[in-house]
From Swiss-Prot:
Pfam families reported in the protein's UniProt record: Anticodon_3 (PF19303), tRNA-synt_1g (PF09334), tRNA_bind (PF01588)
Protein name stated in the entry: Methionine--tRNA ligase
Cofactor entry: Zn(2+)
Catalytic activity as recorded in UniProt: tRNA(Met) + L-methionine + ATP = L-methionyl-tRNA(Met) + AMP + diphosphate
Length: 677
């Protein structure tokens, strides 16, 4: 028998500045299912996480609420832990990045990088708020767009016209925090020399540690050349001060991933069988997996392994990257009620409904997952209640009534039982590969076979016939054993259902190896309902409870878009005709390293190619979703040189900004290069 594997698993750290929602839960449920499977197999799997508790946003929110940053993060952490526990996410440790373990590790890793020559310093000029006495990130500066004149725009791009610019180009800049007019001020910043690790990263990203599509996207960034990474922020800042640099603090994204190590170190202090170096040492033979969303790949696949390499630690075995959650085919929306907080869901529905639905949809790729609420109700009611639980409810009564609750050991359908046992390796392989949807399909196919066989045997009819009682017990006994097999296969997904089934079956906690055995001459406990159907009214109530901003949406037309943004002054036809609008095909769309709001679009306009930067990242967090779409493009706008490259024109979008930006598309039949008239 092989030695148990040593596996350390993490999920991305939720930010300690807001509530957990169903999009977050996709990742934690996915990770929890995989870890539970590993533990059922007898492996030493350890699952750690923590709240990401540093940064200006936390400091400023705490200030607004009249509490300390520590009080804020403690309250949010307690809320997060309650949500996770009620969704049956079973962390071995849930810590905080604002911990002594993280302070010590962050400082030690930084000093190792510095002493090895991987840290650089240079002055950076930024806007400074003279009232708050703090430097301002781009998102904390607002002013008038230098291109279209729209007021109240952020410091790096205009949400009205899509233009991008440096904060210093804004007209009438103001601090979004205090309203004061900022001044330019120079400050010494600290940089991690990421280019030092380019060769290692090119090799590691192609080593099998990443899904192929993720590796391909990273190759584009690597081929375009890596830049040094700014790892410092100036006081005031809520975080850890950089050693030997008074008033300078680690940028939150430096100490956040180190929080994985800190949480594990905190656990090691309580569990002597765990050795920190055995999991994190340079020559560790343990496995290390990070489950993350595709929006933070660059931090985990470039900065993080480079930091670990430079500081003498091991690199991850693999990153397991997933897509985003949509609801009913659209982005989560507060106005539609589909931006559902974890607690709101829990107030209305059983967490195992969602755990199963996510499992039934999750593959090993990075595609987005859609929570279709009608399908959600139908699938849970059909699969879990109508198939799995139905087997036990059909059979248990006959065993209690006809044999005092004792399950006999007969096997009236050896081929069916063999099919269940033979399916186990394939289901295990699907779990291991994170092909949860394949595992669920195979399990439900077995449930269908079991139900069909029981219906064919019809124990309810046999029970009415003289001399058929032994057959009734044999049929129902096998039915309960098949139900037990299904519970074993579903236990990583449905731990609460499994615990209730174990109580009914009168057995110890089931392991994966138990699928090889049968219950025989075994006393069952009285059967209790294991799961109820989803009531559509409860789903509707959850959506209603999640709706926000409906009052604004229902205002009369006099308070509509034209009032918010009046029609501009008239122009003559010649002025309009001077703007050359073309149809463009988006061949490639990608993140811009170092830019909070920009996407880089490679456009085909018929006989030419164009490169455009557009401030639409907040509305399109998955850039690849735009690839292959047609859009409207201003072809004769003068090229604009930016720090990220040259933007050759502008794509057109509508909406007030933020998540509500809508890229314009032509009707079907339009072709790249055609002029809009």
């Amino acid at each position: 028998m092989s030695e148990p594997r040593k596996i350390l698993v993490t999920s991305a750290l939720p930010y300690a500045n807001g509530s957990i929602h169903l999009g977050h839960m996709l990742e934690y449920i996915q990770t929890d299912m995989w870890v539970r499977f590993q533990k059922m197999r007898g492996n030493q799997a350890v699952y750690v996480c923590a709240d990401d508790a540093h940064g200006s946003a936390i400091m400023l929110r705490a200030e607004r609420e009249g509490i300390t940053s520590e009080q804020l993060i403690d309250a949010v952490r307690a809320e997060h832990m309650g949500d996770f526990a009620d969704f049956l996410v079973d962390f071995d440790n849930y810590h905080s990045t604002h911990s002594e373990e993280n302070r010590e590790l962050s400082s030690a890793i930084y000093l190792k990088l510095r002493d090895a020559g991987h840290i650089d310093t240079r002055p950076v000029t930024q806007y400074f708020d003279p009232e708050k006495q703090m430097f301002l990130a781009d998102r904390f500066i607002k002013g008038t767009c230098p291109k279209c004149g729209t007021a109240d725009q952020y410091g790096d791009n205009c949400e009205a016209c899509g233009a991008t610019y440096a904060p210093t180009e804004l007209k009438d800049p103001k601090s979004a925090i205090s309203g004061a007019t900022p001044v330019l001020k120079e400050s010494l910043h600290y940089f991690f020399k990421l280019p030092d690790f380019e060769a290692m990263l090119k090799q590691w990203t192609r080593s099998g540690a990443l899904q192929e599509s993720v590796a391909n996207k990273l190759a584009e960034w690597l081929d375009s050349g890596l830049q040094q990474w700014d790892i410092s922020r100036d006081a005031p800042y809520f975080g850890f001060e950089i050693p030997d640099a008074p008033g300078k603090y680690f940028y939150v994204w430096l100490d956040a991933p180190i929080g994985y190590m800190a949480s594990f170190k905190n656990l090691c202090a309580r569990r002597p069988e765990l050795d920190f170096d055995a999991f994190w040492g340079k020559d560790s033979s343990a496995e290390l997996y990070h489950f993350i969303g595709k929006d933070i790949v660059n931090f985990h696949a470039l900065f993080w392994p480079a930091m670990l390499e430079g500081a003498g630690y091991r690199k991850p075995t693999a990153l397991n990257v997933h897509g985003y959650l949509t609801v009913n085919g659209q982005k989560m929306s507060k106005s539609r009620g589909t931006f559902v907080k974890a607690r709101t869901y829990l107030d209305h529905l059983d967490p195992e409904y969602l755990r199963y639905y996510y499992a039934s949809k999750l593959g090993r790729g990075v595609e987005d997952l859609d929570l279709n609420l009608e399908d959600f109700v139908q699938k849970v009611n059909s699969d879990l209640v109508g198939k799995v639980v139905n087997i036990a409810s059909r059979c248990a009564g006959f065993i209690h009534k006809g044999n005092a609750g004792v399950l006999v050991g007969a096997d009236p359908a050896p081929e069916l039982l063999a099919a269940f046992r033979e399916a186990a390796p394939g289901i295990a392989e699907a779990y291991e590969a994170r092909d949860f949807n394949r595992a669920m399909r195979e399990i439900m196919a077995l449930a269908d076979r079991a139900n069909a066989w029981i219906a064919e045997q019809a124990p309810w009819a046999l029970a009415k016939q003289e001399g058929q009682q032994d057959k009734v017990q044999a049929v129902c006994g096998l039915g309960i054993n098949l139900f037990r097999q299904l519970v074993i296969f579903l236990k990583p997904v449905l731990p609460k259902l499994a615990a209730a089934a174990e109580a009914f079956l009168n057995v110890a906690p089931l392991t994966w190896a138990d699928h090889r055995t049968l219950l025989a001459n075994h006393q069952l406990n009285p059967f209790q309902p294991l799961m109820t159907r989803i009531e559509p009214a409860k789903v509707e109530a959850m959506i209603e409870a999640s709706k926000e901003d409906l009052a604004a949406a229902s205002q009369p037309a006099g308070n509509g878009e034209l009032v918010k943004e009046p029609i501009a002054a008239e122009i003559d036809f010649d002025a309009f005709a001077a703007v050359d609008l073309r149809i463009a095909l988006i061949e490639k769309c990608e993140f811009v390293e170092g830019a909070d709001k920009l996407l880089r679009l490679s456009l085909d306009i018929g006989d030419a190619k164009r490169n455009v930067f557009s401030g639409i990242k907040s509305a399109y967090p998955d850039p690849s979703a735009l690839e292959g779409r047609l859009t409207l493009y201003v072809a004769n706008l003068a090229p604009r040189k930016m720090k990220f490259g040259v933007s050759e024109g502008m794509v057109l979008a509508a909406g007030p900004g933020g998540e509500e930006i809508y890229l314009l598309s032509p009707d079907s039949g339009a072709k790249p290069g055609q002029r809009v008239k």
